[in-house]
UniProtKB/Swiss-Prot annotation:
Family: Belongs to the krueppel C2H2-type zinc-finger protein family.
Name of the molecule in the record: Zinc finger protein 44
Annotated keywords: DNA-binding, Metal-binding, Nucleus, Repeat, Transcription, Transcription regulation, Zinc, Zinc-finger
Biological process terms in GO annotation: regulation of transcription by RNA polymerase II
Pfam family, one: KRAB
The organism of origin for this protein: Homo sapiens
Lineage of producing organism: Eukaryota, Metazoa, Chordata, Craniata, Vertebrata
Length: 663
């Protein structure tokens, strides 16, 4: 029933609504279609579908808007709403939240009361003589379809229409007990697949759609389809449009004021829906309902292929795509496709440059939530989420969890096949797929399996050597986007991680490694060989020498490697292949990094600058060695005589003096 979808402002829109209602033709008990459009309604409603909810067709005005309307406009409003009720009444529609007597006691407190008065007035200002019971009688006697019992139209008394923060409501004061209606008996329908009890047939049909995959509601702007009008409305919240209701903060426009209010919560952070069990709050009611199922354990949607169950249909759909490989969300600029709409939105920020996550302490902005949370670790503060070990406070729980991982090496998940210990259940599950090969995405080269298509794609690059992420400044390519972001800091000079001694670092691991130089502690001990490390980074790197399977073997010398890329690099020592050639002097190199380093001898580029004296260097290692002349740091110590050196080359030269003594 596309009577008047949304809130109309002003006389032309209301007249348009009235004209539309005159053009309606009744084709059955479940739907009313516009004349001349027998197939599809304005918002994608097919002819065999049930009617939409009352709030989808109601016309609303606030106090301020109502005061600006003239007498003729108010009369037109009255006529439109009366006709809306007639149509809904005709099909036996009922609404929740019918009893709102207590909300109409105080006229100043509740804006709905005055709507009763304006609805009951006649065109000349006197009380309207026609009652809704008379409307009901005429509808029941003349227009009630055969399949709808008369009790489906039992509106007998005062009807109150008005504005609410989220919905419009109807109150029905009948004064008599209705006869039981078999078509609309309470909880008369039970869905076989999810066991949900439903009151009305149209509710049953709506619940049926997610199970059948039927999506009759389509967005006219992007063509995306939905199983219910509510899902279409949620889609419009994200999409926005050219509607009359504009957000004052970002300028995004919406067709309905309720969608604008929902959108505004993304700016204000308002979360009105709070879980009574864990106090977690949500900005949208549907998100709150989805969360509640975590506590109840309800998982009505089960995957037919692997029997995994999910609490909501959207999670079930996302999971199904891991089996089918479907990627329905495509980037309009570069054509890259994604299985989840959220991944597409994050990807689009690469093109738009949007960075919605801003650090309040230093002003730095990020396009990824994960990058933002990692950044927040460097700021010590009094945030509400405390580290259980050192008491450091963080603004986000994710940041606190990441930080806690730097203290503890607890790994409760043990693989029974290889004995490897893992700290997270998700990591353990992914690791087991490598043994069983049961994941939905299986590598044809090594047989490893993965549950995530993105992780699988990253793994494939270890075989193919593909490096799709290229630095725009120097042309260096990387296998992962995180490696590219880390590299880009070498050009920008950005070093957000600052030590108390004044030294700054571009990445978290380098910062944590440096922090250990202030302490002689070596808290990270290898359980296999007993070797201890002061840095968690070096400990992890060492652990891989024990745990990593070396499945890539050189056919010439038999040496094995844990990664295909390592094997390919090693093979060049046998073949003398040097695929990376300088365009200016034709000198060739094994590694692309060696080529880049060499090219700087032609360009004279020196991107690495000493912070103490401003001297520039072509290599980062040269810059680090030079900086030690300022700091006095000497990390290379001779075990024979105890003498320490600031550079590895000086240390190696010194070691030869001991070899001469031995010879």
């Amino acid at each position: 029933m596309a009577l008047c979808y949304g809130t109309f402002w002003g006389y032309p829109k209301m007249l348009e609504a009235a004209n539309l209602m005159e053009g309606l033709v009744d084709i059955g008990p479940w739907v009313t279609l516009p004349r001349g459009q027998p197939e599809v309604l304005e918002w994608g409603l097919p002819k065999d579908q049930d009617s939409v909810a009352f709030e989808d067709v109601a016309v609303n005005f606030t106090h301020e808007e109502w005061a600006l309307l003239g007498p003729s406009q108010k009369n037109l409003y009255r006529d439109v709403m009366r006709e809306t009720i007639r149509n809904l009444n005709c099909i036996g529609m009922k609404w929740e939240n019918q009893n709102i007597d207590d909300q109409h006691q105080n006229l100043r407190r509740n804006p709905r009361c005055d709507v009763v008065e304006r609805f009951g007035k006649s065109k000349d200002g006197s009380q309207c003589g026609e009652t809704l019971s008379q409307i009901r009688n005429s509808i029941v006697n003349k227009n009630t379809p055969a399949r709808v019992d008369a009790c489906g139209s039992s509106v007998n008394g005062e009807v109150i229409m008005g504005h609410s923060s989220l919905n419009c409501y109807i109150r029905v004061d009948t004064g008599h007990k209705h006869r039981e209606c078999h078509e609309y008996a309470e909880k008369s329908y039970t869905h076989k697949q999810c066991g949900k009890g439903l009151s009305y047939r149209h509710s049953f049909q709506t619940c049926e759609r997610p199970h059948t995959g039927k999506k009759p509601y389509d967005c006219k702007e992007c063509g995306k389809t939905f199983s219910s009008p509510g899902n279409l409305r949620r889609h419009m919240v994200v999409k926005g449009g050219d509607g009359p209701y504009k957000c004052e903060l970002c300028g995004k426009a919406f067709f309905w004021p309720s969608l604008l209010r929902m959108h505004e919560r993304t700016h204000t952070g308002e979360k009105p829906y709070e879980c009574k069990q864990c106090s977690k709050a949500f900005p949208v009611y549907s998100s709150y309902l989805r969360h509640e199922k975590i506590h109840t354990g309800e998982k009505p949607y089960e995957c037919k292929q692997c029997s995994k169950a999910f609490p909501d249909y959207s999670s079930y759909l996302r999971h199904e795509r891991t089996h089918t490989g479907e990627k329905p969300y495509k980037c309009k600029q570069c054509g890259k496709a994604f299985s989840v709409s959220g991944s597409l939105r994050v990807h689009e920020r690469i093109h738009t440059g949007e960075k919605p996550y801003t650090c309040k302490q230093c002003g730095k902005a990020f396009c990824h939530l994960g990058s933002f949370q990692r950044h927040m670790i460097m700021h010590s503060g009094d945030g509400p989420h405390k580290c259980k070990i050192c008491g450091k406070g963080f603004d986000f729980p994710g940041s606190a969890r990441i930080h806690e991982g730097t203290h503890t090496l607890e790994k409760p998940y043990e693989c029974k096949q290889c004995g490897k210990l893992l700290s997270h259940r998700s990591s353990f599950r992914r690791h087991m797929m490598a043994h069983t090969g049961d994941g939905p995405h299986k590598c044809t080269v090594c047989g490893k399996a993965f549950d995530s298509p993105s992780v699988f794609q990253r793994h494939e690059r270890t075989h193919t050597g593909e490096k799709p992420y290229e630095c725009k400044q120097c042309g260096k390519a990387f296998r992962t986007s995180s490696s590219l972001r880390k590299h880009e800091t070498t050009h920008t000079g950005e070093q957000p991680y600052k030590c108390k001694c004044g030294k700054a670092f571009s990445d978290l691991f380098s910062f944590q490694s440096h922090e250990t130089t202030h302490s002689e502690e070596e808290p990270y001990e290898c359980k296999e060989c007993g070797k201890a490390f002061s840095s968690f980074k070096y400990f992890c790197r060492h652990e891989r020498t024990h745990s990593e399977e070396k499945s890539y073997e050189c056919q010439i010398c038999g040496k094995a490697f844990s990664r295909f890329s390592y094997l390919k690099t090693h093979e060049r020592t046998h073949t003398a292949e040097k695929p990376y050639e300088c365009k200016q002097c034709r000198k060739a190199f094994f590694w692309p990094s060696f080529l880049l380093r060499h090219e700087r001898t032609h360009t004279g580029e020196r991107p690495y600058e000493c912070k103490h004296c401003g001297k520039a260097f072509s290599r980062s290692s040269f810059c680090r060695e030079h900086e030690r002349t300022h700091t006095g740091e000497k990390p290379y110590e001779c075990k024979e005589c105890g003498k320490a050196f600031s550079s590895l080359s000086s240390f190696n030269r010194h070691k030869r003096t001991h070899w001469k003594d031995i010879l």
